[in-house]
From Swiss-Prot:
Region Required for homotrimerization and for interaction with CAVIN2 and CAVIN3: start-end pairs: 1-100
Parts forming coiled coils: 201-284
Native organism: Mus musculus (Mouse)
Family: Belongs to the CAVIN family.
Residues annotated as signal peptide: none
Biased amino acid composition, Basic and acidic residues: 1-10, 173-183
Result for mutant: residue 158 to F: Significant loss of phosphorylation and loss of regulation of ribosomal transcriptional activity
Lineage, broadest ranks: Eukaryota, Metazoa, Chordata, Craniata, Vertebrata
Protein name in UniProt: Caveolae-associated protein 1
Region (Nuclear localization signal): 138-154, 235-251
A molecular function (GO) term: rRNA primary transcript binding
The record's note on its domains: The leucine-zipper domain 1 is essential for its localization in the caveolae.
Gene encoding the protein: Cavin1
Length: 392
């Protein structure tokens, strides 16, 4: 507010000479009337003027005091308004930080959800492939059961008809016997190979006919043996042992695929759990969790009045300058039994698990305060509570 200047204008009185000079000239009757009053009238006028002056001065003092008070209140209001502006600015800064944190968390959550969707799609595809494999295995088992039930295999072997000549000369038969490969010679039994001594001996017509019959018989036996071998091969291919081996192989392959899928699912689950734990530690810090845990324990104790009270003694130090007070609180109760820790050998798998846990604890330690500072804070708060109770 601006300073207001007050101008006091005094009204002229009829008794003063200023009034006679400024006003109109009085008549002769009025002049006589003015000349008539004695010294008593002039004294009364002076007293009334003094009283009016004192009143005006007191009013001026009051007005000046009110103006000063208004100025003081205005200055206090300006200071409060400046403090309010600072508080509003700090609140706006914290709100902007909170918005940024929420944006980052929403981005991480959206990325996690996308990864979870991809994992679910992969799991669905793996399940579909496993179901298809199971259907194929069932079909194979059904076909195998039908084949084992039948156990009768009819194999048709088609061969070109070889027209053998009615008569063969000994020279041709000898040439053919010499031209036979060693492999075919191994297949032939005893008595099938023609004797080498016949080349040197001249044979008669009866002996030539006998040699031709022996050659024809050897060829027929060879064809029979090759057919029997093929039938044996087919039987071996569709035998019980081979079918059982194929069953065992298919089962082993199925078990391997199932184990691989289980391992992959467990790995994905572990990775998701790790990421969710990291996100949880980011959203809810360790201090907050400890506070929630202690509050839960206190609530449980409050609802269970018969809980065990352990004996303890605490020393709290608090300073009231220029004094320092050491307060020792002793609580009676049962002696707390500390659990003994056992040393356990750690293997390579435990080392991996310990490394993962160490990473998690390192992340937690980065944001958690020291234990000593927490204990000092609790002791100071307990000391303040004791002071308040003593003062009450």
């Amino acid at each position: 507010m601006e300073d207001v200047t007050l101008h006091i204008v005094e009204r002229p009185y009829s008794g003063f000479p200023d009034a006679s000079s400024e006003g109109p000239e009085p008549t002769q009757g009025e002049a006589r009337a003015t000349e008539e009053p004695s010294g008593t009238g002039s004294d009364e006028l002076i007293k009334s003027d003094q009283v009016n002056g004192v009143l005006v001065l007191s009013l001026l003092d009051k007005i000046i005091g009110a103006v000063d008070q208004i100025q003081l209140t205005q200055a206090q209001l300006e200071e409060r308004q400046a403090e309010m502006e600072g508080a509003v600015q700090s609140i706006q800064g914290e709100l902007s930080k909170l918005g940024k944190a929420h944006a980052t968390t929403s981005n991480t959550v959206s990325k996690l959800l996308e990864k979870v969707r991809k994992v679910s799609v992969n799991v669905k595809t793996v399940r579909g492939s496993l179901e298809r494999q199971a259907g194929q295995i069932k079909k194979l088992e059904v076909n195998e059961a039908e084949l084992l039930r039948r156990r009768n295999f009819k194999v048709m072997i088609y061969q070109d008809e070889v027209k053998l000549p009615a008569k063969l000369s000994v020279s041709k038969s000898l040439k053919e016997s010499e031209a036979l490969p060693e492999k075919e010679g191994d297949e032939l039994g005893e008595g099938e190979r023609p004797e080498d001594d016949t080349a040197a001996i001249e044979l008669s017509s009866d002996e030539a006919v006998e040699v031709e019959e022996v050659i024809e018989e050897s060829r027929a036996e060879r064809i029979k043996r090759s057919g029997l071998r093929r039938v044996d091969d087919f039987k071996k291919a569709f035998s019980k042992e081979k079918m059982e081996k194929t069953k065992v192989r298919t089962r082993e392959n199925l078990e391997k695929t199932r184990l691989k899928t289980k391992e992959n699912l467990e790995k994905t689950r572990h990775t998701l759990e790790k990421r969710m734990n990291k996100l949880g530690t980011r959203l809810v810090p360790v201090e907050r969790r400890e506070k929630l845990k202690t509050s839960r324990d206190k609530l449980r104790k409050s609802f269970t009045p018969d809980h065990v009270v352990y004996a303890r003694s605490k020393t709290a130090v608090y300073k009231v300058p220029p004094f320092t007070f050491h307060v020792k609180k002793i609580r009676e109760g049962e002696v707390e039994v500390l659990k003994a820790t056992e040393m356990v050998e750690v293997g390579p798998e435990d080392d991996e698990v310990g490394a993962e846990r160490g990473e998690a604890t390192d992340l937690l330690r980065g944001s958690s305060p020291d234990v000593h500072t927490l204990l000092e804070i609790t002791e100071e708060s307990d000391a303040v509570l004791v002071d308040k109770s003593d003062s009450d």
